[in-house]
A protein has these predicted regions:
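Glycine-rich, small-residue loops and helix-cap segments
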Residues: 33, 73, 366-495
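Short glycine/serine-rich loop/turn segments
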Residues: 72-219, 244-247, 273, 407-424
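Short, well-ordered alpha-helical
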Residues: 25-99, 128-130, 248-252, 257, ...
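Structural helix-boundary/capping segments
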Residues: 118, 169-274, 288, 293, ...
């Protein structure tokens, strides 16, 4: 273990020990979660979901008792690319930011604190939100090592919000916050058997969140039920003058928990993206059970023959690479003090100089490609084309032409074996989340069962700013669901 990683591990251990020694009435809930972190995250199954805990969590829990409201006292974990005031750094999983203690809350965190939410700690993630290399292992970071899937310890937790997904599934907090550029909330939710919601881009602030792409980035809630995810979203959503994308958020947000308990599928027309269910018979069979439950709940199902446009993936990558170079530099230069790393080029140089910490398992080919992606005209053309393909000619057209309110497909295939040597092996061809990611539209993943003990989620995708109705559809599906949701085994697959 590198000496700096050992130091962070000691910080985590010391923080847990200090909080755990408090009086019985101080932070009872926090203490319960910390005991679970100690016994199944640090030792035993060693999930490696939590990077560090907040040493003031018990005090925050006590203070929250004076706050009235449904979020007061709720204990959450936060993905470690989101800034949280206090002693913990925001690293994005990289040793390049191991000293990035900014002393400030991201606006979305400030909103949650005002509502009485207790920040328990920071979660591991796919380093740089899975945008450093095309050969990466989801859930691995230089700082945090490899996060494990609590349903099958040798299987991927998906990413990049790996620790948030695994942590919620393992009961290490009431809920967690993840971030998504394309699949980074919904895929870990699916793989870990929990609910994950990627809201409409612009509903939640991205200020003081380590960026990949302002075109697609958004934080989102991860929880064990749609109701809990909606409640957490209530505290997260809102306008931020520092994030122009959120200009309309205060006017368009609502109480996302309203109507969940009585939401019905009766008469709701739902588009079925059959091709996006892949070719694996067991995944298709599980999807068919979910469709049967939707139909039994009163939904009208409309089969849709849709194929992803060949240009969409290419244009999306062009956008992400260009944004990465620009947005990362802006973030680094905006850090308090005199940050030593001020550009993507600086990060590339850091990784080369610290290859023993960062480059042992995979390289930085995406970083290097992004550094060379400087053609703004090509970027603007790719952005316009990808928005057209995913939005106007994608989700918008599919909803309107077929007269449906939502689109459904499996979120992902079963979790694949962790492979640090050659990287992720998700060749399932399952999922439609890229449409929602590129268009910036809402996408909910709700557990729909498991294949051989490996959870799979049902994706529900809706129109822009139709977040509340997407959540209502998810809650109605939860009630209609007849398939058992798997419980984490905390064992290797097949044991």
């Amino acid at each position: 273990m590198p000496h700096r990683l050992r130091a962070l591990s000691l910080l985590l251990t010391a923080s847990i020990a200090t909080i755990g020694l408090g009086p019985a009435h101080a932070g009872d809930t926090v203490a319960t979660y910390l005991e679970r972190i100690r016994t199944i995250d640090q030792s035993g199954p060693t999930l490696h979901a939590v990077l560090a805990v907040n040493p003031d969590a018990a005090k925050e829990e006590l203070a929250a008792r004076a706050i009235k409201g449904p979020l007061a006292g709720k204990v959450i974990l936060v993905k470690d690319n989101i800034e949280v005031a206090g002693p913990l750094p925001t690293t994005a999983g990289s040793w390049a930011l191991h000293g990035n203690v900014t002393g400030r809350d991201a606006p979305l965190i400030a909103r949650l604190r005002k509502a009485g939410v207790v920040i328990l700690g920071k979660t591991n993630l796919s380093e740089w939100a899975n945008m450093r290399s095309g050969s990466s292992s989801s859930g691995w970071s230089g700082v945090g090592g490899q996060t494990r899937n609590p349903h099958a310890l040798d299987r991927s937790p998906c990413g990049s919000s790996s620790g948030s997904g695994a942590g919620v599934a393992a009961g290490l907090a009431w809920a967690a916050i993840g971030t998504e550029t394309d699949g980074s909330v919904t895929c870990p939710a699916s793989a870990n058997g929990i609910v994950g919601f990627k809201p409409t881009l612009g509903l939640v602030s991205r200020t003081h969140v380590v960026p990949l792409s302002h075109s697609q980035d958004t934080p989102g809630p991860m929880a064990t039920s749609v109701a809990d995810a909606a409640l957490l979203l209530n505290g997260m959503a809102g306008s931020d003058p520092l994030d122009p994308a959120t200009l309309e958020a205060d006017k368009l947000k609502t109480d996302f928990t309203a109507g969940l308990a009585t939401a019905s599928l009766k008469g709701v027309r739902i588009g079925v993206l059959r091709k996006q269910a892949g070719t694996e018979p067991k995944v298709q069979a599980l999807f068919d059970k979910a469709l049967a439950d939707l139909k039994a709940g009163g939904a009208e199902l409309v089969e849709i023959d849709y194929t992803f446009p060949a240009d969409l993936g290419r244009d999306e990558l062009t956008v992400l690479l260009f944004d990465l170079r620009e947005d990362m530099g802006t973030y680094l230069r905006g850090l308090p003090g005199n940050p030593p790393l001020r550009s993507l080029a600086d990060l590339i140089a850091f990784n080369k100089a610290h290859a023993d910490l960062e480059l042992h398992w995979f390289g930085q080919d995406l970083f290097e490609s992004a550094e060379k992606t400087t053609d703004r005209a090509a970027y603007e053309k790719a952005r316009a084309n990808s928005l057209r393909l995913a939005g106007v000619e994608g989700i918008d057209k599919l909803l309107a032409t077929n007269k449906v309110s939502f689109l459904v497909a499996p979120t992902s295939g079963p979790a694949w074996p962790i492979d640090l040597v050659t990287g992720d092996h998700d060749g399932s061809g399952v999922g439609a989340g890229t449409l929602a990611a590129v268009a910036g539209y809402p996408h909910l993943s709700v557990p729909m069962g498991a294949v051989e003990g490996l959870p799979i989620g049902l994706s529900i995708i809706g129109a822009k700013w139709d977040d509340a109705h997407v959540l209502q559809a998810g809650a109605a599906y939860e009630r209609a669901r007849t398939v058992a949701v798997p419980v984490p085994s905390l064992k290797r697959w097949g044991d």
